[in-house]
C-alpha cells in the first residue's frame, strides 16, 4: 500500500498494524515528505515497523503521490489453488477526514493485467524491480506525460481529418507548458475541449484564433473537488483515465503517479 496523507487517527493504518500482528505480510510505501503530514507519517511508519511490517520510503528524489493498495490472496478453484491480486487505485488519499470532505474516484478490481501492472510498480518502489513497460497504467515520471500528449495529439489529428474529436479533463491545477501548448493546437484544429480546474490554471480560454474551442470552469460546492479524470473520444473508443496527478511539472516529472 502507498501512504501519502492518512492523518493521526486512521482505521486503515490500524488495520494494517493488526494484519501484521496476525502474521500477514504487510508492505507499506510511506511518503515522509507529504507537506503538513510529515509527523503523522513518521509516527505510522514507526508503529508499522514495530509490529514487523516492511516499511519503505519510495524512490530517492521523487515523491510517491500515487494511491495504490494491493491484496494478494491464495484462493481455491476447481483446478487447484491460485494467487489472486485485488487492487484499489484512487484519485484521493487514504485519509479518513478528507474522504468525507473531498470528492474522489477509486477503482477496485481483480483484473489480472491491472494487478500485474500494480505489482510491477510496487516492486519498483520497494527496490525489488526496475521500471517496466505497463499495459494499463500510465506511470509518472516515465510515461504519463508522453501518453497525455499523445492522446491530445490524436484528437488534433482526428479534428484535422474532419472526424469527431473531444477532450474533457478535470483536475486541481493546470500549469505544465507543453500540455497547454498541445491543448491550444487541438483547439485551433477544431477539437472541443472542456476543462474543469479547481485551482490554478494558466491556460487562457476563449481567445480567437488560439483557444476559442476551450472552456474552463471550476465547480464550487459542498465538497472539495479533488478527483482527476480525463476523457478522450479516441476515434470512438472513448478512453477515460483516472489519475492521482494534476497537469503540472511536479506531477509529471518529479512524482510517482
Stretches found by the model and what they are:
Residues 5, 11-12, 16, 22-99, ...:
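PLD/PLD-like phosphodiesterase catalytic module centered on the HKD motif
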Residues 128-137, 162-164:
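Gly-rich Lys/Arg/Thr-decorated short loops/hinges at beta-loop-alpha junctions or inter-strand turns
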